[in-house]
Amino acid sequence: PKEWMLKSMKDGKYPDIHLQKGNVVIGSMAEGCTYLLKERGVSRLHAKIMEKADGIYLLDLNSTNGTFLNGEMIEPGRDYKIEEGDMVAFANCEFVIVTSLLN
């Protein structure tokens, strides 16, 4: 099995976001978020990453400054499938999707 994660594009500026089974909510408010990203432009509840039977999906939670997939702003409330190597940005916090094999 593979472990999916989002790795910071700025050399470890932000901790890795590990996508364990289930949902990961990214935002700037401790309550309700799985991953806290206290940066300017990041909404309290910014985006959600979900694991489904056919892959990993990204969902913008009506954030103020948007969620971007490979440089394009995604539409809030719609699921976007993400793949290894994709670039994801929450406001201007940029990450790349990587996988590693679990032993």
State where each predicted segment sits.
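C-terminal boundary/linker segments immediately following FHA domains
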Residues: I26, F68-N103
